[in-house]
A protein has these predicted regions:
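Intrinsic disorder/low-complexity segments, especially N-terminal tails and targeting/processing regions
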Residues: 22-23, 43
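Short helix-onset patch at the extreme N-terminus, typifying the N->h transition
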Residues: 7-9, 30-33, 52-53
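N-terminal exported-region signature
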Residues: 43-237
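Bacterial N-terminal signal peptides
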Residues: 33-40
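Extracellular/surface-exposed low-complexity segments
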Residues: 4-7, 43
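Short, positively charged and aromatic/hydrophobic N-terminal segments
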Residues: 6-8, 13-19
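Positively charged n-region of N-terminal signal peptides that target proteins for export
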Residues: 2-3, 24-29
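Generic short amphipathic/hydrophobic targeting helices enriched at N-termini
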Residues: 16-21, 32, 88
Length: 237
């Protein structure tokens, strides 16, 4: 870490790593320029100009299906704002109490079925890239800060970290392990399933420390009861 730039989760410094997705932070008045590859925020170079961290995240969407999330607050977090102009042949599937809602971008008319649909940080959703190759989406907005809360209902939901940070789900990202919980991560080879044993207080991953979640990655959560995924986060501490 250079030039004194640190981020904190509660009273602890964020763990160093990841070089998956570049993130840059900008605001209005120049204070410092720093390299933040050690911040855990996706191995990034950053220019920080004030306490409000505004920046971008580049996310690659493979051909076909993936589960992603919006890692930054962008206005009202409307699909039309988050994905920008002409994002390509994309269809978004958002999961809720009534099942999936489907929202497609029409490349001929250059508009979404519902451009006002909201995809806020903390919500995961499927994206189907119907193009011939992987596409890159650039998310632009503010890093969520303060006392953050993400509702985890009983049963299945699709969620993500509200902070654009890669790390172990519970130890780094503050995911609650108050009961037995199962996490399903979707990739090129299908699902990777990680379960937490509340009696033995460990995950069934090889290191027993739980799954690693990437920046702008969404995943399924299965819980026996509802709770909130809470975290205090600030870029200025």
């Amino acid at each position: 870490m250079k030039k004194g730039l640190t981020l904190q989760f509660a009273s602890d410094k964020l763990p160093a790593h990841t070089e998956i997705i570049p993130v840059k932070m900008r605001t209005k008045t120049l204070i410092l320029t720093a390299f933040v590859g050690a911040l855990g925020i996706a191995g990034a170079s950053a220019q920080v100009y004030s306490v409000n961290a505004v920046g971008y995240v580049n996310k690659s969407l493979p051909k076909g299906f993936s589960i992603v999330s919006n890692p930054l607050n962008s206005g009202g977090n409307k699909v039309s704002e988050v994905f920008g102009a002409n994002p390509g042949a994309l269809t978004i599937y958002q999961f809720g109490d009534a099942g999936f809602s489907v929202n497609s971008f029409d490349t001929d008319f250059e508009e979404w079925d519902n451009g006002d649909a909201v995809v806020a940080p903390g919500e995961g959703f499927f994206v189907n890239n119907a193009g011939d190759a992987a596409a890159t989406v650039t998310f632009v907005g503010e890093v969520p800060q303060g006392d953050l809360s993400n509702a985890l209902p009983k049963g299945f939901s699709i969620r993500s970290s509200q902070v654009p940070q890669e790390g172990k789900l519970d130890s780094d990202l503050g995911f609650p392990t108050d009961e037995a919980v199962t996490v399903y991560q979707y990739g090129a080879n299908g699902y990777t399933i990680s379960s937490y044993d509340a009696d033995f207080e460990e995950w069934d991953t090889d290191d027993a420390a739980g799954p690693v979640v990437g920046v702008a990655e969404g995943f399924w959560v299965l819980r026996e009861s509802a709770t909130n995924w809470t975290r205090s986060f600030s870029t200025s501490e």
